[in-house]
Amino acid sequence: KKITQNKSQGSVYFMEAFTNRINLGGKQARYYDLSHFNQPLDSSSTPRAPAHFYSGNSFTVGTYTPLLSKLATEFDISSLALRGYWYDKPQSRRLTREQDADMLIEFLEKTQDNPVVGIGHSQGATATAMAAAKRPELFSQLYLIEPVTFTKNQATLYNLLPRSVLLSREPFKSTLTKQSTWPSIHSYYESLRAQRAYKRISNKHLQVFAEQSLSKNTDGSYTLMFAPEQELANYFG
């Protein structure tokens, strides 16, 4: 159950300073220990409850920094990244929420001594709910933000649709043509700002989103940490 911390130097991305590695299912997974966000506890203070945050598809943990920095004042937070940007990236064309739930269960078994507050967004919320249904003793409470849910009939119909049909519809269609490499953080920010989906996000928070979505290449360009092909595989799940 050895857990090692990433000691890479020179990162300009704040959240990456809290990156760790752990072996899950025989793969090198990425997770974040955000306990250092917390200010020192007074001796008279009640210890913060352990919590886990599971992000949505295509969103790195760092893109949630404004939210997580606030949650960290109340909770000792860890966050397992979705498999799309683990160190050992999946090769499957279909990544399911059941698999994400199983990875979360293994992660909590290896890192936690007490039940955690499960917090999740979108597909991460769905996987958190599934994990809690399988292993309720691992969780003390759940906070689910916009979980992706289907009725039984909807799920049956969805699974019967041919891959070619799904690829002609959103969000599959736009993910297929999503630009993954950018000349600068600013160019990616400007692209996001022009999109309707990000209209209500403040300039400050959108800047954080842009910065935390990208990794710098040796030639000075930037690449999305969560690759579109991995995002697509999650949608098929």
Indicate residue ranges for each PLM-predicted region.
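Active-site loop/oxyanion-hole signature of alpha/beta-hydrolase fold enzymes
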Residues: 79-119
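Conserved HGGG/HGGXW glycine-rich cap/lid loop of the alpha/beta-hydrolase fold
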Residues: 30-90
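A conserved amphipathic alpha-helix that caps or lines the catalytic cleft of carbohydrate-
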Residues: 68, 108, 131-132
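Conserved hydrolase catalytic core segment
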Residues: 114-156
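N-terminal cap/lid segment of alpha/beta-hydrolase-fold proteins
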Residues: 15-29
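Alpha/beta-hydrolase
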Residues: 175, 179-237
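A catalytic-pocket lid/entrance helix-loop region that shapes and gates access to the active site
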Residues: 148-180
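Polybasic, lysine-rich low-complexity intrinsically disordered segments
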Residues: 2-6
